[in-house]
Amino acid sequence: VPPIGWF
């Protein structure tokens, strides 16, 4: 699962 901030 990609971390918050991947967006």
From Swiss-Prot:
Expressed by the skin glands. It comes from Pithecopus azureus. Signal peptide: none annotated. Its main location: secreted. It is found in: Secreted. GO terms for biological process: defense response. Belongs to the frog skin active peptide (FSAP) family. Tryptophillin subfamily. This is Tryptophyllin-T2-9. GO terms for cellular component: extracellular region. Keywords: Amphibian defense peptide, Secreted.
